[in-house]
């Protein structure tokens, strides 16, 4: 039988408690970390047509687009914001393809309170027809929001092709 000295016995007790202490410190650290900012990208396929635009809108890997050569299409693009009393939207970006030489893609972003009231609005436009994508940016005010809504008008299809909302990106701080 092996006899342990007092110092060996203490070190065994400490080594048994060490993992518990480290885990406890880790949990404390994890619980006191500040909330992280969010950066989420949404595909244009999340946008849904308004009732009058249902027959003009189609979806593919380029997102939502208007196939009508006679009328523009209106869509609503949702956001999934985490519930927070202090959530602030820092930036919203859209990637669009505008193929109409006379009408731009137009999107209006709304910050909405819990009761449904509009807190702020921002509108962005594409800058003319182009075969390559364009980035549209909103500069939202630094106020807290409960949720957001974005409505967009996609111009008619032309011989240049159809206009798309491909992706939209949301950046927030807690």
Language-model-derived ranges and their functions:
Residues 31-37:
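Sec/Tat signal peptide C-region and signal peptidase I cleavage site
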Residues 140-158:
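Noncatalytic modules at the cell exterior or secretory-pathway interfaces
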Residues 67-86:
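Short beta-strands within extracellular/lumenal beta-sheet-rich domains
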Residues 19-30:
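Bacterial N-terminal signal peptides
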Residues 87-98:
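A short beta-strand element within beta-rich, extracytoplasmic domains
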Residues 1-13:
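N-terminal secretory signal peptides that target proteins for export/translocation
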Residues 107, 153-174:
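Exposed low-complexity, polar/acidic, P/S/T/G-rich flexible segments that act as propeptides
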Residues 102-115:
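Short, surface-exposed beta-strand/strand-loop-strand elements in extracellular ectodomains
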């Amino acid at each position: 039988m092996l006899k342990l000295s007092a110092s060996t016995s203490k070190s065994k007790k400490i080594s048994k408690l060490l993992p518990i202490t480290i885990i406890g410190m880790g949990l404390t650290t994890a619980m006191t970390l500040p909330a992280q900012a969010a950066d989420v990208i949404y595909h244009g396929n999340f946008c849904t047509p308004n009732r009058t635009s249902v027959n003009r809108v189609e979806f593919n890997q380029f997102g939502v687009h208007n196939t009508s050569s006679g009328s523009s299409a209106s869509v609503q693009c949702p956001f999934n914001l985490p519930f927070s009393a202090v959530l602030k939207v820092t930036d919203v970006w859209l990637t669009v393809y505008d193929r109409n030489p006379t009408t731009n893609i137009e999107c209006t972003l709304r910050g909405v309170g819990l009761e449904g009231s509009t807190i702020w609005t921002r509108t962005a436009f594409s800058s003319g027809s182009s075969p390559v994508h364009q980035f549209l940016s909103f500069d939202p005010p630094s106020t807290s929001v409960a949720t957001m809504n974005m409505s967009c008008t996609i111009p008619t299809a032309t011989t240049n092709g159809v206009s798309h909302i491909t992706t939209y990106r949301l950046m927030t701080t807690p």
